Amino acid sequence: MRAKPLASIVSVGISKFGRREGVYARELFAEAALEAFQRVEKLDPGKDIKAAFIGQMSESYEHQSHNAPIAASWAGVPPAPAIRVEYACASSGTALRCGIMAIKSGM
């Protein structure tokens, strides 16, 4: 007998590839997040999203240290808590892991 998963990935989005002058990390995040939101028919991001775990390392080249709340706001998910996770090349995977742990812990 298989147990039901406690956390599931229900949608994904991706920003356009290539060199994009003047486009900041918050815009790339919003582009991917909005695509993912559009794929979930009954999702209301402002109501249904309880927290955002965002993996990125753009602080050193964008000179912006509180990226997660800004990116979440650009994607339309305020006032949910937004946490930036930084772990070099594993930032996104670690953010996903933190989100799964939050769900499994009852957040």
Predicted ranges, named:
Residues 86-107:
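Active-site-proximal alpha-helical scaffold in enzymes
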Residues 1-80:
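Conserved "HGTGT" condensation-loop signature of ketosynthase/thiolase-family condensing enzymes
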